[in-house]
From Swiss-Prot:
Cytochrome P450 monooxygenase; part of the gene cluster that mediates the biosynthesis of hancockiamides, an unusual new family of N-cinnamoylated piperazines. The NRPS hkm10 and the NmrA-like reductase hkm9 are proposed to convert two molecules of L-Phe to the intermediary piperazine called xenocockiamide A. Xenocockiamide A is then converted to hancockiamide D via a series of hydroxylations and O-methylations. Gene3D superfamilies: Cytochrome P450 (1.10.630.10). Its main location: membrane. GO terms for molecular function: heme binding; iron ion binding; monooxygenase activity; oxidoreductase activity, acting on paired donors, with incorporation or reduction of molecular oxygen. Pathway: Secondary metabolite biosynthesis. Keywords: Glycoprotein, Heme, Iron, Membrane, Metal-binding, Monooxygenase, Oxidoreductase, Transmembrane, Transmembrane helix. Belongs to the cytochrome P450 family. Heme binds at residue 456. It comes from Aspergillus hancockii. It catalyses: hancockiamide A + reduced [NADPH--hemoprotein reductase] + O2 = hancockiamide G + oxidized [NADPH--hemoprotein reductase] + 2 H2O + H(+); hancockiamide B + reduced [NADPH--hemoprotein reductase] + O2 = hancockiamide C + oxidized [NADPH--hemoprotein reductase] + 2 H2O + H(+); hancockiamide D + reduced [NADPH--hemoprotein reductase] + O2 = hancockiamide H + oxidized [NADPH--hemoprotein reductase] + 2 H2O + H(+). This is Cytochrome P450 monooxygenase hkm5. It comes from the Eukaryota.
Length: 512
């Protein structure tokens, strides 16, 4: 009689401990996620602040709009504030957005105790730079060291070099146009901004980038890093990890810039006082070297100086360069604006001939030029997205809502600059709105350089560059948008406003 074959054991019999462990882990995961959702919806300190359900539960809204849709998150805020009829909305589990000018001025004031959110400002692994310093006292000390370079008087001293670098670019553009080639001013004026900033950083170092038909490597790398920032919000250790795995690897443009910084820095790093005294105007790097010697009695590292320099370059490219492109585009789109601007420039006689010394007081008081620049800042918010701050222990009252301590709080320039009550028809470029003689709220809402203690240190330099460039350009040159012209100038939020398409022009000397 044959013995029957025993049945094969089931999977549960073969791997009982593993199956039970997986089941247990799944239950733990479900309970943890479910508990977090319940806590965020019904027991969180922000539960009474209105906003999308998905935003209260997770960071999905930010991920979807900023990464999947590529930098569109901050453009949803005005609609959300309207939908919920509230000056404050919840845009994340512990993140709120303000659209209230009084609250904005409380948060972004001189001496504010609403500190920068460290997880946001250090995600690009640049936590030693002046921009990313979150400690108020440490930032104040660093700013004092550099402030002499960024006063109005110091900015005016740089005018000859600003004009020299501008004329180099215009000569290149004239040559391009004579050859029948269109000029990509989106890349060219941003490249010019790099060379302007580099002059303040490194003094007489020559041009960091050259002008060509193709985008310079350094500009390509800056754009790549900016595009990566929304991703770094979710993976903040990505760059530090990559740097630790391949510390000597840098993109081509960044590597070349660091080499320029190294060549400039090494002869100065151990004897800063002597080198500064030999020049009428120190550079940012020289002042940082001197400060390190004075406070720490030792020189800074070359890597530290290169990182600080790169942060300045990164900050200056799209703020000044992008605003110039926006101004030129909108001026050329409206013959009436171009005519009125030229009439004012011609009447001022400030730009009669190249090389004429500029009366900066008179230049700063040209009403229509200033109106064009203000409107360019408004319609092209250089930093359109959230600039997160941490609510201090006393909290913040916004209308009928109380925002508790520890909440991450943001207020965006895009929302302020496109406020329909203050700026009717906000998508239209209307410089005349800045020529009003009555008291209005426009100046309070226009904050292209932010406000308070953490406002952009380079505001005087940037404004001088904008006035000089637009004044010189439209006094001496004829510009024409290439066909087909863009119907509008659109941007996406890569921390800075990044153009969706380039502006192309032809240029020639102005006919008498």
């Amino acid at each position: 009689m044959e013995t029957p074959t025993p049945p094969l054991p089931s999977k549960d019999q073969l791997f009982p401990p593993l199956i039970q462990l997986v089941r247990a882990l799944l239950w733990v995961l479900v309970i943890t996620i479910g508990g977090a959702i319940v806590q965020r919806l019904f027991f969180h300190p922000l539960r009474k602040i209105p906003g999308p359900l998905t935003a209260a539960i997770s960071g999905w809204d930010e991920f979807y709009h900023n990464i999947w849709r590529d930098g569109e998150w901050c453009k949803t805020y005005p609609k959300l504030h309207k939908e919920y009829n509230s000056p404050v909305i919840r845009i994340g589990p512990n993140h709120v957005h303000l659209n209230d000018i009084d609250a904005y001025e409380t948060v972004f004031r001189v001496g504010t105790n609403f500190y920068k959110d460290k997880t946001f400002y250090t995600c690009a692994d640049n936590d030693g730079s002046i921009f990313s310093l979150c400690d108020r006292d440490e930032h104040s000390e660093r700013r004092k060291v550099l402030s002499s370079l960024f006063s109005k008087q110091a900015a005016e001293m740089t005018a000859p070099k600003v004009m020299s670098k501008l004329n180099e670019l215009l000569d290149f553009m004239i040559t391009q146009s004579k050859e029948g080639k269109a000029c990509n001013i989106t890349d060219l004026f941003r490249a010019l901004a790099i060379n302007w900033v580099a002059d303040t950083l490194l003094g007489d170092c020559g041009d960091v980038v050259t002008y060509a038909e193709t985008k310079p490597d350094l500009l390509e790398d800056i754009d790549g890093l900016s595009k990566l920032i929304p991703t770094l919000r979710f993976f903040p250790y990505l760059i530090p990890t990559l740097n630790s795995l391949a510390p000597s690897t840098s993109p081509a443009g960044v590597a070349k810039f660091k080499k320029i910084c190294e060549n400039y820095t090494r002869p100065r790093i151990n004897d800063p006082i002597k080198n500064i005294s030999q020049r009428s105007r120190a550079s940012v790097v020289e002042l940082l070297i001197a400060h390190r010697h004075e406070v720490y009695h030792k020189p800074p590292t070359v890597d530290y100086l290169a990182e600080e320099a790169f942060t300045f370059i990164d900050a200056g490219v799209d703020t000044t360069g992008g605003t110039l492109v926006a101004a030129i585009y909108h001026i050329l789109r409206d013959p009436g604006i171009l005519r009125r601007l030229r009439e004012e420039l011609d009447e001022s006689q400030l730009f009669l001939s190249k090389g004429t010394p500029i009366d900066f007081k008179k230049l700063g008081n040209l009403p229509y030029l200033n109106a064009v620049i203000n409107e360019s800042h408004r319609i092209w918010p250089a930093l359109p997205g959230p600039l997160p701050r941490v609510v201090p222990p006393e909290g913040l009252q916004v209308g009928s809502f109380f925002v508790p301590s520890g909440t991450i709080l943001s207020s965006t320039h895009h929302c302020l600059h496109y406020n329909e009550t203050v700026f009717p028809e906000p998508k239209k470029f209307k410089p005349e709105r800045w020529l009003r003689t009555d008291k209005w709220e426009g100046d309070r809402y226009l904050n292209p350089y932010s406000r308070g203690s953490r406002a952009c240190i380079g505001i005087n330099l940037a404004q001088m560059e904008l006035r000089l460039t637009l004044g010189h350009l439209f006094s001496h040159y004829d510009l024409q948008l290439c066909e087909p012209t863009l119907s509008s100038l659109e941007w996406k939020d890569h921390f800075v406003a990044h153009p969706k398409a380039p502006v192309m022009i032809h240029i020639g000397f102005r006919k008498a």
